[in-house]
Structures are given as structure tokens and as C-alpha cells.
């Protein structure tokens, strides 16, 4: 089965100290270089519940009521980008599905993004990223935090940028 997502040939997937498996640089990655493109099927929040019940979390949010991800167990592995959450990430979002380096990344570094760049939901989780500026608890509403909006300017999902403009006039 063909892969649904693209991972840069400068990366590899291996065990992560953050959680499960992660995406790691095998070669130097330059700022704004594409490191992953999330692929899959487009579905709404109602369908998301059924997909998550069957596959667990394997999607990313691309609109207020739109998600992209696998629909079957066979597609799950090939749709993953293996980017764990970090409160001090080194990759961010351009558009809705393209992940790029926010700075130069050295070989051996784990590629991480902050879920505040992509998620708008009611979830909450204890953070284990280990960053010096770790928020300890990550929520699906963190995108509303002014400090994160400023920190991730240019690296947040398009739909969140639009929501910020509507809600906060930015």
C-alpha cells in the first residue's frame, strides 16, 4: 500500500524519549525546509469519533470541522508523520498539511511540533516534552494564548490563523 504522508529522506522514525516513536533528523535540515506532509482522507468531527475509536489518534485538524488522516488500520502507519508534541518545537505548519523546520536542525534531533499549531478541541493532556519552558498541561485551546500566537507566527495551521483573526482581530 502506498504511503499517505511524505517524510523527508533526511529523517528516520525511531523510539522517542518523549513518547512512542518519533521523527529524527539524519542529516542537517535547513530552516523552512519541508520535513513532512500529512496525507490521508478528509473527514468531519462526527466521523472523527468513529475513526479514533477504531484507530486511536492518527489525524491532524485542518479546519474548524475538518481533519485529515487514515480511515483503516492498513492506512494508519503510512499516514503518520511521527511528530511528537513539544512546548519548544523545531518544526511548524505552513498551510494546513505541510510541516517545515522553524530553524536549522542538526542530525540526531527529534522533530517536534506544538499541538497549539494545529489543534482546536476540548482535550487536555499532561505534557512530557521535557522542554525548559514546558507548559506541563497541553490543551486543545492553547492556540488562544497570545504568547503562543506570537511565538509561532508563520508556523500555525491556516485555519487557526483565520480563527485568531476573527476572535482577536489580529
For the regions a language model picked out, list residue spans one by one.
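Catalytic cores of histone-lysine modification enzymes
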Residues: 2-91
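C-terminal SET catalytic tail plus cysteine-rich post-SET Zn-binding segment of SAM-dependent SET-domain
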Residues: 85-170
Amino acid at each position: 500500500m502506498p504511503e499517505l504522508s511524505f517524510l523527508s529522506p533526511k529523517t528516520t522514525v525511531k523510539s522517542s524519549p518523549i513518547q512512542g516513536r518519533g521523527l529524527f533528523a539524519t542529516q542537517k535540515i535547513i530552516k523552512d525546509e519541508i520535513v513532512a506532509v500529512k496525507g490521508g482522507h478528509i473527514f468531519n468531527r462526527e466521523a472523527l469519533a468513529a475513526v479514533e475509536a477504531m484507530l486511536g489518534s492518527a489525524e491532524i485538524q485542518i479546519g474548524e470541522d475538518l481533519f485529515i488522516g487514515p480511515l483503516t488500520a492498513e492506512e494508519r502507519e503510512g499516514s503518520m508523520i511521527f511528530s511528537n508534541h513539544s512546548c519548544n518545537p523545531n518544526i511548524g505548519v505552513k498551510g494546513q498539511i505541510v510541516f517545515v523546520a522553524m530553524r536549522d536542525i542538526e542530525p540526531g534531533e527529534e522533530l517536534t511540533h506544538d499541538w497549539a499549531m494545529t489543534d482546536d478541541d476540548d482535550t487536555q493532556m499532561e505534557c512530557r516534552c521535557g522542554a525548559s519552558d514546558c507548559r506541563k498541561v497541553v490543551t486543545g485551546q492553547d492556540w488562544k494564548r497570545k504568547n503562543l500566537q506570537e511565538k509561532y507566527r508563520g508556523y500555525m495551521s491556516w485555519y487557526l490563523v483565520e480563527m485568531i483573526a476573527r476572535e482577536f482581530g489580529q
